[in-house]
A protein has these predicted regions:
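Beta-strand-rich domains and repeat architectures in extracellular enzymes and scaffolds
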Residues: 36-64, 78-82
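Blade-loop segments of beta-propeller domains
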Residues: 64-101, 115-121
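Conserved beta-strand position repeated once per blade in WD40 beta-propeller domains
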Residues: 46-51, 80-82, 128-130, 184-186, ...
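Secretory targeting and sorting signals
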Residues: 1-28
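Loop/turn-rich, solvent-exposed surfaces of beta-rich toroidal or solenoidal domains
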Residues: 179-230
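Structural motif
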Residues: 67, 98-106, 147-157, 203-219, ...
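Conserved blade-ending motifs and adjacent loop-strand segments that build the rim/top face
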Residues: 225-255
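Surface loop/turn motifs at the tips and blade-to-blade linkers of beta-strand repeat domains
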Residues: 37-44, 71-76, 118-125, 174-180, ...
Length: 284
């Protein structure tokens, strides 16, 4: 009788553990700790950031309304998002105020600029919030604003022959997510099959926290065909200011060379000018 009860107890515990594991939200214990911050200027450091490595030089480059070239803005591309850089190439994403298309502006290692236009496909949002280039440089992921269940995949301008200047940059594939994400402002590759993303989600209903740092584990490295991704919320991003109110999470950058993750968070109210920050995080 006691042995039978013990067996039933073990089985019940195993079943309960399995149920709890399957029912648990896509939210993991914090694994990234804040190690410091730098002031972020609202004019030219408020949208995104990346590190460009060319030869022996290292450039920390930011985007903001003040970094949009006048001729680009004059043609209707009035918003720049979070950029990325691989193998000396640099790509920054643009959207138009009239919602009529997207553009990716690429700079070669030699410094030459080329524009790659993308016509919206059926059901595609006009937002062009960020770009994230695969570590091998072949493919580029991008994102839409709002509550989404997918990421967009393109051939990387300058690095993939399928991206042709002067022709439409094709939507090559999508990444179907197993959990909705909201207001993602930037992503960067942590590895060939994992991304870290900064979400400006003000609601908190998706993961139980607002402004989360997300991790997306891909089923495989992007190869031009549709694939899936598993979403996990890691922690709330740092929110600290002398002012109270709504923060705005912006772009993100991860550097494997020193393991540093950087995320821009703009402060509320008038403090946006004084104490907006680029936060530095490392795995704890």
């Amino acid at each position: 009788m006691q042995k039978s009860f013990a067996r039933r107890a073990v089985v019940a515990a195993a079943v309960l553990a399995a149920v709890l594991a399957s029912a648990a939200p896509a939210h993991a214990a914090t694994s990234w700790v804040t190690v410091g911050s730098d002031r972020a200027r609202p004019l030219d450091e408020s949208q995104g950031l990346t590190v460009i490595r060319r030869g022996g030089t290292v450039e920390y480059r930011y985007t903001g309304v003040g970094t949009i070239p006048p001729d680009v803005a004059a043609r209707g591309f009035d918003h720049v998002g979070d950029p990325d850089s691989v193998n000396g190439w640099y790509v920054e994403p643009y959207e138009r105020g009239d919602h009529s298309g997207k553009m990716f502006r690429a700079q070669s290692p030699a410094g030459a600029w080329t524009e790659y236009r993308h016509a919206l496909t059926a059901g595609e949002a006009y937002n062009n919030s960020w770009s994230a280039i695969t570590p091998d440089g072949t493919w580029m992921l991008a994102g839409e604003w709002g509550t989404m269940n997918r990421l967009l995949g393109f051939p990387t301008p300058g690095l993939n022959p399928a991206a042709v200047a002067g022709a439409d940059l094709p939507l090559a594939f999508t990444v179907g997510l197993d959990h909705a994400v909201r207001d993602v402002q930037g992503c960067d590759f942590l590895s060939a099959t994992a991304l870290l993303c900064a979400s400006d989600d003000p609601d908190g209903t998706l993961f139980g926290i607002t402004k989360p740092l997300l991790r997306i584990d891909l089923a495989r490295g992007p190869d031009g065909a549709a694939l899936t991704g598993h979403v996990t919320a890691l922690r709330q991003l740092p929110l600290s200011s002398a002012c109270s109110g709504s923060f705005e999470v912006e772009g993100i950058d991860y550097q494997a060379a020193d393991g540093t993750l950087r995320v821009i968070v703009m402060s509320p109210s008038v403090c946006v000018v004084f104490d907006s920050k680029t936060w530095r995080l490392k795995q704890g």
